[in-house]
Regions:
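Positively charged n-region of N-terminal signal peptides that target proteins for export
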Residues: 1-4
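C-terminal motif of bacterial Sec signal peptides marking the signal peptidase cleavage site
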Residues: 16-19
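Flexible, processing/modification-adjacent segments and terminal tails
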Residues: 25-35, 39, 82-133
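Post-signal peptide N-terminal segment of mature Sec-exported envelope proteins
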Residues: 27-54, 75-76
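An acidic-aromatic
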Residues: 52-109, 151-158
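Gly/Pro-enriched, hydrophobic low-complexity segments
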Residues: 59-64, 115-167
Length: 167
């Protein structure tokens, strides 16, 4: 009887440990969507509206703070264009210094497309690493993004009104 109890305990304990961070069947739905979001990065807060095409091309319009309101960012692969008051600036995101909040958000969404989804503490997420940064994009049960964070630098994003385009 003691052996059976011990075996049962070991089995239950191993199930408990394996459930701490398990792989799951949720697929990230980070393309073909539109959303509004609030991004906090380096003690600054930004609001924006975004659309991500099926091919990954992403447009983000910054709506606040007032000094940046109206700035539109177009991302395609590693190339980006910033538009503001009729002026355009083209750049390669890999050549820009870290610190551009919405560029960081775009990179997280792009990495999530091919990321593996895990489950921890009843939260689905993808994790991507770039240098010392460890970025997590949290997903709902449908695969749509809910929030994102990088504890190493204080980056966080909250997704609102996420909709699948064309549906």
């Amino acid at each position: 009887m003691k052996k059976t109890s011990l075996l049962l305990f070991i089995f239950m304990f191993s199930l408990f440990l394996s459930g701490c961070r398990q792989k799951c069947s949720v697929t990230p739905l980070v393309r073909g969507i539109s959303f509004s979001c609030t991004v906090k990065y380096y003690n600054e807060c930004y609001d924006g509206e975004a659309s991500v095409a099926e091919n990954g091309d992403t447009d983000i319009k910054i709506t606040s703070p007032e000094g940046l309101s109206g700035l539109i960012l177009h991302f395609k692969g590693d190339d980006a264009t910033a538009e503001y008051s009729g002026f355009n600036y083209k750049y390669n995101i890999s050549e820009m210094p870290e610190g551009m909040a919405f560029t960081y958000l775009y990179e997280m969404l792009r990495a999530a497309k091919k990321g593996e989804v895990s489950l921890e503490d009843d939260k689905y997420f993808t994790e991507s690493k770039k240098g010392s940064r460890i970025c997590r994009l949290y997903l709902g049960a449908t695969g749509l993004p809910i929030s994102a964070e990088d504890a190493s630098n204080g980056f966080s994003a909250e997704f609102k009104n996420v909709t699948v385009m064309g549906k």
